[in-house]
């Protein structure tokens, strides 16, 4: 079985979905820009040797339809011989794309794959065209399709207070802002063309979604949006709506060494798991336990953790049951998370993995975990190991 390694990882800046910098950029443009950018950073790689492109995307319609992976590859001018497939496991789509590519490499069906994901939530809203089967309500509560209400349920089950949520959200913005000021995102962001408020073209090289002015006191003034009468989840403690793409260059360790490329991380273990759709945000817990078991490791072995912040009310129960609450400032989402940066659905899996790998390098860490919840009750996890 071949060992799978990451030789590079990149992302676009995260743009605001409502009137943001990428309002005139299409999902294919963001994706093609990254495909070209990651190959330009690694000239040792002959594009003709890429076996396949695995690209995550949730809302596969409008500009993201008709296999956005292939459309972006053609737009990027990549060799027509390279295959391309768009992968959908809802919020875990691009992490699933990584898993699919890894397995192809492990069994020898590929030596090099290009992996990533995109979501332009400004152009293709999350609920666009969604039509749940009426019979689904026989087995699943209707509210299970409303992500904010599942976060409310999970938070209540675990006794997560409004104060805790507001503090977690403020932490996300503060850490993401500090990471920006200190240049900690510089190596993972590929500057990308966008449009300023006045319509002029400019190059965006920072995440415009972060709100550095966020405070716990300010968040406390917001009203609950999903359960106005009894809820605690607000817009401020939910992941921001944003547009973005992320990419990884993945290959066998043997191929990376033959090309003289630096191995940034190995894939140690992968897992997915299901959970009750009504508390879909709990998925990272069973998925992480599976991945740890497959890796022969424990949570204490993880030096750095990226836990996707769909909602504060969702992240905190997962952190609690994974034994991470006492280690937040040492291990978890050290550069902030999706509450500050946004959660462009199909992009987020490889986005958090990219941030994780950069953090592992900065901290000289051995093991890192990237994990996320998935709508309708799933979780996905990947354990990375540095050489």
From Swiss-Prot:
Enzyme class label: transferase
PROSITE patterns given in the database record: THIOLASE_1, THIOLASE_2, THIOLASE_3
SUPFAM superfamilies: Thiolase-like
Residues in the signal sequence: none
Catalytic activity: an acyl-CoA + acetyl-CoA = a 3-oxoacyl-CoA + CoA
Keyword Flavoprotein tagged: no
InterPro entries xrefs: FadA, Thiolase, Thiolase-like, Thiolase-like_sf_Thiolase, Thiolase_acyl_enz_int_AS, Thiolase_AS, Thiolase_C, Thiolase_CS
A single GO cellular-component term on record: cytoplasm
A family per Pfam: Thiolase_C
GO biological process: fatty acid beta-oxidation; phenylacetate catabolic process
EC number: 2.3.1.16
Principal subcellular localization: cytoplasm
Metabolic or biological pathway, per its Swiss-Prot or TrEMBL entry: Lipid metabolism; fatty acid beta-oxidation
HAMAP family from the UniProt entry: FadA (MF_01620)
Family to which the UniProt record says this protein belongs: Belongs to the thiolase-like superfamily. Thiolase family.
Quaternary structure, from the entry: Heterotetramer of two alpha chains (FadB) and two beta chains (FadA).
Protein name according to UniProt: 3-ketoacyl-CoA thiolase
Lineage: Bacteria, Pseudomonadati, Pseudomonadota, Gammaproteobacteria, Vibrionales
């Amino acid at each position: 079985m071949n060992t799978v390694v990451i030789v590079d990882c990149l992302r676009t800046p995260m743009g605001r979905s409502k009137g943001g910098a990428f309002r005139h950029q299409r999902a294919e443009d963001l994706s093609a820009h990254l495909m070209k950018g990651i190959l330009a950073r690694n000239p040792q790689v002959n594009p003709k040797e890429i076996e396949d492109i695995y690209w995550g995307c949730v809302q596969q319609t409008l500009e993201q339809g008709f296999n956005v992976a292939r459309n972006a590859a053609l737009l990027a001018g990549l060799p027509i011989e390279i295959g391309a497939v768009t992968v959908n496991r809802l919020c875990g789509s691009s992490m699933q794309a990584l898993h699919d590519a890894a397995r192809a490499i492990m069994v020898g069906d590929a030596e090099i794959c290009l992996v990533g994901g995109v979501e332009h939530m400004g152009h293709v809203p999350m609920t666009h065209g969604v039509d749940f089967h009426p019979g689904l309500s026989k087995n699943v509560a209707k509210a299970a399709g409303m992500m904010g209400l599942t976060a409310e349920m999970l938070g209540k089950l675990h006794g997560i207070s409004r104060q805790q949520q507001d503090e977690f959200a403020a932490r996300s913005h503060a850490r993401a802002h500090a990471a920006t000021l200190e240049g900690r995102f510089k190596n993972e962001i590929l500057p990308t063309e966008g449009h300023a408020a006045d319509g002029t073209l400019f190059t965006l090289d920072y995440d415009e979604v972060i709100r550095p002015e966020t405070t716990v006191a300010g968040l406390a003034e917001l009203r609950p949006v999903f359960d106005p009468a009894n809820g605690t989840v607000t817009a401020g403690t939910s992941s921001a709506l944003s547009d973005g793409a992320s990419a990884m260059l993945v290959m066998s360790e043997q191929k990376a060494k033959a090309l003289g490329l630096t191995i940034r991380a190995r894939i140690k273990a992968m897992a997915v798991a299901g959970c009750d759709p009504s508390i879909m945000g709990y998925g990272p817990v069973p998925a992480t336990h599976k991945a740890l078991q497959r890796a022969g490791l424990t949570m204490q072995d993880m030096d750095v953790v990226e836990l996707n912040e769909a909602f504060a009310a969702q992240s905190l129960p997962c952190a609690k049951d994974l034994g991470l609450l006492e280690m937040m400032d040492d291990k978890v989402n050290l550069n902030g998370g999706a509450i500050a940066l946004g959660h462009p659905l199909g992009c987020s899996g490889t986005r958090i993995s990219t941030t994780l790998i950069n953090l592992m390098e900065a901290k000289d860490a051995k093991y890192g975990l990237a994990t996320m919840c998935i709508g309708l009750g799933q979780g996905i996890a990947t354990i990375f190991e540095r050489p």
